Structure formats: C-alpha cells, structure tokens
C-alpha cells in the first residue's frame, strides 16, 4: 500500500508537468519530432514538482492546512485541464501517435543494426534494474545524517506536523525568539526540497 501511495504522489507532479509542457509547446513543431517526447517526459517532473511546491506556498500563505485533498485535488484538476488544452491544440491522434512512436523507438531504435539494438536493450534492462534497486534502498533504509537530514528533513518534519510553512532561524535568533521560530543549520536554504518531502509524507500518510 505504501508503494502505491508513494507512486501516486510522485506521478501527480510528473503528469502535471508533462501536461503543462505539452499544452504550452509550439504547435508548429510536430509532436513526433526527434527527441520531443524524451525532453518533455524528462523535464516534466521538474516542472510539475516546482508547480507543486508553488501551490503549497500559496496554501500556507492563505492559512490552509496541508493535506492530500488541499494539495492533490486542485493539481489533479489543473493537470486534467492542461491535458485537455494540449489535446485541443495538438490533436489527440497526433499526440497518441507520437507517444506510441516514442515508446517503440525507446525499445527498438529505428535505423539501428541488430547488434546496436541488442546492446541498447541490455542497457535499458540494466537501468531498470538499477532504478528498482535504488527504489528499494530508498524505501528500506533510514534517512542518513547528511544534508537530507540536517538541512532538509528538519523543515519537512515540522512543516508536515504543523500543516504549513513555519519560520526557521539560526541558533542566535532561535534563542532570542523564545518561541514562534524553529532552529535549523541552514534556515536560508530554499524550501522547494523540504516541501517535496512534505508532499511525500502526505501521500504516505505519515
């Protein structure tokens, strides 16, 4: 169940970013142009993740507590609207044809010799195995005390428990404040990464 929740939490910003990129792309460029699908899928998560954290900032500023519905439902609706815009602008048939063509080219590159194709497929299989092992490592192992712990996860833990973005400060300001501010080794770091961690916690429910 955790794996399904985590997968859904990761896919929402990814699909949102892909829909946004396709909706905004130049209609003069064919959807099946070489490399088009690759860069859209590759950049889709970065765009969607940034949009996700922007929305979380808006919710926090508006005093709305972080939650699966408050964050996920509007973004899912936005992704559906952007997908509809992309469908209307570029034509559904053209997009489906481009997506299927990209999948075929990924598995069996056109104009490649038999030996090159086999080598490419072996490389893909190795990458799939590598990412599967990395996913298991992320799921099974605790958070290591590196940057993820001392500078990112501290904020994520507080923001998740409080349901909003809370201020952090260095030790001197923390001692002087007495309350209302939290301590962190790097309070000036951008909040994007901790907010992504908060969203992951919300997707998992813990």
Language-model segments: which ranges?
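Short alpha-helical segments used as structural interaction elements across diverse proteins
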Residues: 8, 54, 114, 127, ...
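Low-complexity, intrinsically disordered, cysteine-poor segments enriched in small/polar
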Residues: 95-109, 121, 138, 155, ...
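Membrane-embedded, hydrophobic transmembrane alpha-helices
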Residues: 1-111
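Internal/C-terminal transmembrane anchor helices
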Residues: 107-134
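Structural signature of transmembrane alpha-helix termini at the membrane-water interface
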Residues: 23-24, 55-62, 83-87, 129-140, ...
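Alpha-helical transmembrane segments at the extracellular/periplasmic loop-to-helix junctions
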Residues: 4-18, 120-126, 130, 187-194
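Active-site lumenal/periplasmic loops and adjacent helix-entry segments of GT-C-fold
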Residues: 131-206
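Short hydrophobic/aromatic-rich motifs at helix boundaries and adjacent loops
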Residues: 24-30, 124-129, 166-170
């Amino acid at each position: 169940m955790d794996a399904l929740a985590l997968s859904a939490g990761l896919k929402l910003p990814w699909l949102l970013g892909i829909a946004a990129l396709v909706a905004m792309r130049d209609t003069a460029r064919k959807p099946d142009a070489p490399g088009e699908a690759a860069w859209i899928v590759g950049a889709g998560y970065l765009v969607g993740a940034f949009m996700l954290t922007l929305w979380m900032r808006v919710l926090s500023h508006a005093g709305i507590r972080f939650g699966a519905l408050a964050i996920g439902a509007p973004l899912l609706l936005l992704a559906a609207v952007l997908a509809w815009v992309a469908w209307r602008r570029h034509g559904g048939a053209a997009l489906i044809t481009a997506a299927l063509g990209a999948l075929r080219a990924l598995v069996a590159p056109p104009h490649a010799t038999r030996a090159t194709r086999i080598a490419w497929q072996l490389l893909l299989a190795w990458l799939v195995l590598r990412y599967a092992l990395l996913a298991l490592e992320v799921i099974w192992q605790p958070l290591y005390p590196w940057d993820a712990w001392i500078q990112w996860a501290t904020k994520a833990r507080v923001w998740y428990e409080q349901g909003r973005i809370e201020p952090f400060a260095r030790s001197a300001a923390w001692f002087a404040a007495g309350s209302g501010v939290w301590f962190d080794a790097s309070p000036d770091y951008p909040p994007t990464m901790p907010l992504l961690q908060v969203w992951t916690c919300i997707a998992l429910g813990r």
